[in-house]
Amino acid sequence: MVILFQLALLLLVVMSFVLIVGVPVLYATNGDRVQSNRLILVGGLAWTALVVLVGVLNYFVV
């Protein structure tokens, strides 16, 4: 269970860095706005799910 918690936490940190860099880049590009907004929404939802998962796993680990 500890390894699963550590992997989820690592994934959360990596996803946070990707979103910190990716969101401004996607907003600054002149590409397809609908696809960019969808990508940002999916990234935000995945990040939120990871926060909840880390919280639940933290309850079981500690």
From Swiss-Prot:
Q: Write down the Pfam families for this protein, in alphabetical order.
A: Ycf9 (PF01737)
For this protein, the record's HAMAP family field holds:
PSII_PsbZ
Gene field: psbZ
Its subunit composition reads: PSII is composed of 1 copy each of membrane proteins PsbA, PsbB, PsbC, PsbD, PsbE, PsbF, PsbH, PsbI, PsbJ, PsbK, PsbL, PsbM, PsbT, PsbX, PsbY, PsbZ, Psb30/Ycf12, peripheral proteins PsbO, CyanoQ (PsbQ), PsbU, PsbV and a large number of cofactors. It forms dimeric complexes.
A single Gene Ontology biological process assigned to it is: photosynthesis
Which spans are transmembrane here?
Answer: 8-28, 41-61
Q: Which organism is it from?
A: Synechococcus elongatus (strain ATCC 33912 / PCC 7942 / FACHB-805)
* Record protein name field: Photosystem II reaction center protein Z
Explain the purpose of this protein. Answer: May control the interaction of photosystem II (PSII) cores with the light-harvesting antenna, regulates electron flow through the 2 photosystem reaction centers. PSII is a light-driven water plastoquinone oxidoreductase, using light energy to abstract electrons from H(2)O, generating a proton gradient subsequently used for ATP formation.
Annotated localization? Cellular thylakoid membrane
Instruction: Give the family per the record.
Output: Belongs to the PsbZ family.
Gene3D superfamilies (UniProt xref): Photosystem II PsbZ, reaction centre
